[in-house]
């Protein structure tokens, strides 16, 4: 009797542990959009430019369409609580994210988002701060102070798959501290350059107590899906109906 009881307790514990451990992998994915450049481009632009650039007019159309279709932006904090702790989400939640620190994300995108009370997640590449075409320190502070989330996109956009052990301080630890000192808030979220990741990167991010890390549209890690949260890159050639799908 005692042996059966003990085995039952062990089985129940393992079942609960396994369920909690794998929970994020079985969650319905929240749509997450990823923008880079927001500017006009010519029909002769390179495929890369077209893939990572959205015109201001198209971006405005997309924000309006999201609002008209009932979408509500959520913070990565809310996404984390949903994935890890089963916290409820509002109807039609969405995250709007931005990579690379581009100045027009502040000067153009935020103005459009403000019309609909949308908040975004801005992943900052710290080497670019204050350079021509990129956000200033003050603009990043304003984003944080007005309800947007600041995340880390490494120091100089080198893919994490190329790092040696010595690179992590340069690319992850110091830039994170720089951003935290700038905004006076924890920086708990990370975006992989080029969407590329490996197991070593996941181990490092976990060791540094990041909550979530974001990729693009590649496959998630089965063991730690919260460190490979997928996003949809919005190409400049997409129509607004395509973006909504």
Language model regions located:
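A short alpha/beta connector and helix-capping loop motif
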Residues: 106-126
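Positively charged n-region of N-terminal signal peptides that target proteins for export
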Residues: 1-4
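Charged helix-capping and loop-helix junction motifs
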Residues: 133-140, 167-171
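Short beta-strand and adjacent tight-turn residues that come in two discontinuous sequence segments
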Residues: 123, 153, 213-215
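C-terminal active-site subregion of NodB/CE4 polysaccharide deacetylases
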Residues: 21-96, 102-104, 162-245
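Residue-level marker for buried hydrophobic side chains located in beta-strands
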Residues: 96-97, 150
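Bacterial N-terminal signal peptides
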Residues: 8-17
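Acidic (Asp/Glu)-rich catalytic clusters
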Residues: 110-117, 135-151
